[in-house]
Amino acid sequence: MNKRELILSAAALIALCVPPARAQSTTTSTAPATTPATTPDKPETIAQRKDNQQDRIAQGIQSGQLTPGETKNLETKETDLNKEEHTMRSDDDGHLTSADRAKLNNQQNKLSNNIYDDKHNAAQDHFGNSEVGQRQENQQDRIAQGVKSGQLTAGETAKLENQQQGINKEVSGMRQANGGKLTNADKKVVNQQQNKASKNIYNKKHNARTRQ
C-alpha cells in the first residue's frame, strides 16, 4: 500500500468512528411576565380625614398662609363637624351609618375647599423682624405644633387664634395711630397680652383634651 492509499484508509476509518452530530433544539420556552397584584387605595376613614385636615391647617399656620382669623373660622367649622359626628354616634350606639359617613364626607369636602381657598388667597401673615412681630410669629408656630401633634383640639385652636386675631388688630390700630410705629407703651401692652396668650397656649397643649 503506497503512502496515498494509507492516508485515504486512515481518513475513512476516522469517519466511521465519529458519530454524526445530533441537531440540538434551540427553542426555549419563555414564561409569561407576571404583573404584581395591586391593591386599590382604600378611602380615608373619618378619623384619617380629620387628621389630614388638621395637618393641612397646621402647615398653613406655620407658613403664614393662614391668618389667625382664617384659622379660627376653619377650626370652628371643624368643631361643628366633630359635634355633629358625636351626635350621630350617640344616636346609633357609637356607630356611624352609611348615610352618616356620606354626609360627613360631603361636609369635609367643603371644608377641604375652604382650607385650600384660604391658603391660596391674598391674605397672609407677615410679622416682620421686630420684637413684637417675632413674638406674634412664635405664638403661631406653637399653635401650629399643637395642631399638628393633636395636643390642641379644633375648638381650642379656634379660641387661641381668636385671641391672636384680637391682639393683631390692636397692634394694627396702635401702628395706625402713630405713623406705622409702636411706642414703648404700646409694646409693653402688647407684650403683656402675649404673655397671657402664651400661658393659654401652654395650658391648652398640656391639658387632658387631645384631638380624637
Report residues per predicted region.
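Sec/Tat signal peptide C-region and signal peptidase I cleavage site
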Residues: 19-23
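Bacterial N-terminal signal peptides that target proteins for export
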Residues: 1-8
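Bacterial N-terminal signal peptides
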Residues: 9-17
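Surface-exposed, polar/charged faces of alpha-helical domains
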Residues: 41-44, 59-102, 106, 110-113, ...
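A structural motif
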Residues: 49-50, 134-138, 142
